[in-house]
Amino acid sequence: TVARKRVEADLIFRRVGITFAVYGNNAGTERLIPFDIIPRIIPAHEWSQLQKGLTQRVQDINLFIHDIYHAQHIVKAGVIPAEQIFRNAQYRPEMQDVAVASDIYAHIAGVDIVRAGAGEFYVLEDNLRVPSGVSYMLEDRKMMMRLFPDLFARHRIAPVAHYPDLLLDMLRSV
């Protein structure tokens, strides 16, 4: 049953130590990663379209950051007030006019999406600092393959295990 699989997943995550710290909690509380026992499968035709949009989004984020640290067209045009940029804790004045490799500022982007309806998705947030969810995604996939092997045998589900290799290749390229 689903309830048994939920218990099995929790036991394995606890035994292996797949937890996260609750920030701001002085007690240092460790919790199990949030794991949805019901697999969410995005059909290939939807993923293809979504992937294009997410790729474009990250490219646009890099263009935005480049503009902030160089010409500042978005500020000069009044689209975003200067104080909103320059008083932001993440703004780094020492990066002003610094050329970065391939104009890529965000080498890793954790884009959290939710499905709003058939073929409709929304972005909850873009995490460009430390998208720790990547490691959880890899562990989630391992757990899903363990709990639902027939699902992976019957369907052509895109692999994710090669992500660390892709990340390493990208980091070596800069």
Model-derived features: where do they sit?
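Preference for protein termini
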Residues: T1-V174
